[in-house]
Each structure stands twice: as structure tokens, then as C-alpha cells.
Amino acid sequence: MKVKILVDSTADVPFSWMEKYDIDSIPLYVVWEDGRSEPDEREPEEIMNFYKRIREAGSVPKTSQPSVEDFKKRYLKYKEEDYDVVLVLTLSSKLSGTYNSAVLASKEVDIPVYVVDTLLASGAIPLPARVAREMLENGATIEEVLKKLDERMKNKDFKAIFYVSNFDYLVKGGRVSKFQGFVGNLLKIRVCLHIENGELIPYRKVRGDKKAIEALIEKLREDTPEGSKLRVIGVHADNEAGVVELLNTLRKSYEVVDEIISPMGKVITTHVGPGTVGFGIEVLERKR
């Protein structure tokens, strides 16, 4: 059985994983103030160029989801490439309509399509995608894969935790007032967030990167004891030094058996701003 795994561009999937695990990415869109729209393609040079452009932009662009037709074209393309099944893992349905577009399109094609609402975002999404691919390569059926992913998501084995370091984008996006943004930047305030039951939840404000990193690991510690085995995707929006420091600190408390760094794409960066640092976590084994 030949299965194509498809994620949306908010997954921030590591570039090397796309070929290694046969994971494809369908873009969301960035819409600039003058009406120009551009796809959130998973291309290294495009992403680096976007970081520069959004820093220089006078306003924060808006974003939009893939259309039903976008998904339909992808499904039909995979059928032409002789895939038997398509497995789609999307950004949380509580954060975007992408899941709904994927489901509606699946009803209009004659290739089996299974759509999973991961209730996750960013670097957490490629982790269940990799689990699915490894299970399929070991002979699992698509039904067994879906059951395992459901079990592990309910067990909170996949997590997305990060911090926002620049209030300018929260101000430009209308999320905080100019005064709050001024004070936040002046005091080097970092806003720590995580995905909980599919929703983006701010849980702490701290001063400086070091305290923000400590707050991220403290959030992980709530249900994952120190010494547990982890697979980690470190993500960042034009702040690789920050994510390296985060991973170095994480390794002091956890057994990180696999790690990779992946830049955040255009759409995620639009919402959180350059400078953001975080990680997608897969708990492989919780220490008793």
C-alpha cells in the first residue's frame, strides 16, 4: 500500500524529513496590505527572505487557509502518482479552517483520504507524521496508524511550547496596545505559550530569554518527568542562536535521543513574529 502523508505549511516540517519520510506540505497563504498574496512554500531561501521582509514591513500581513480546491488538486495529483491512500495531518481546527478544507475536499475525490486534526501547531505536527510513516514502513495498516496516533495524542505525547520575544508584531497584529508593546520591549518581556487541547494558551510573561527558556521547560515538566526520553524539533523565526540555547538547556534535564532544528514558515512567523523560539516534543518514554 502506497501512502502519501500530507501536512500543511504551519507544520514547520524539517526539510530533510520531507524526502526521508515522504511528507509533503500544502501551503497556507500570506496576504499583504496591498492585496498581494503569496504561498507559504517550504523552501529555505524563501523563508529566510521572508524574515527580512516582514521585519521591514510597516504592517503585519494577514493569513489565509488552503482552499478546498487546493486540497482537491493535491489529492488528484497523488492519485496520478499511483498513491493508494492520502493521510493528512493538519494544524488544530481551533486555530484555522485548514482541517475543514481538507475534509470537504476528501469527499470530492475517488482516492481514500484520511484527515487527522492534530490539535497541534508548528514543530509538533511533523512528529506524528513521522510516527505514521515508520509504522507504515513496518507493515501497519492505515487503520492501525490512525488508532495509534489517536492514542498518543490523547496521552499528550506530542507538545508545542514556545515564547514570543518581540512585542512589535503583537502590536502590529492588534493583539496588544502600543503602550503594552513599548513596555514589553523595554523590559525585554517574553510571552510563553503552549498548545492545550488545540488552543494557543499564553501561560506566563517573564523577563529575558534565559527565564523564558526555563519557563518552557517548566511547562514540559508538568506532565513529563525529568529524565524522560524525548524526540525534539527545535523551531525558530530567525533566531537560531535562541533555539540552540533552548535545546542545550533541555538536554540538562531530559534524555533527548533525537533532535533537529527547523525554521518557522511564513504563516507561523506572521502570527508570532521574528525572534520566536520553541519546540515540538514527542515523549518517547516517560520516566517512572
UniProtKB/Swiss-Prot annotation:
It comes from the Bacteria. Keywords: Lipid-binding. InterPro entries: DegV, DegV_C, DegV_domain_contain. Hexadecanoate binds at T63, S96. Gene3D superfamilies: 3.30.1180.10, 3.40.50.10170. One of its GO terms (molecular function) is lipid binding. Binds long-chain fatty acids, such as palmitate, and may play a role in lipid transport or fatty acid metabolism. This is Fatty acid-binding protein TM_1468. It comes from Thermotoga maritima (strain ATCC 43589 / DSM 3109 / JCM 10099 / NBRC 100826 / MSB8).
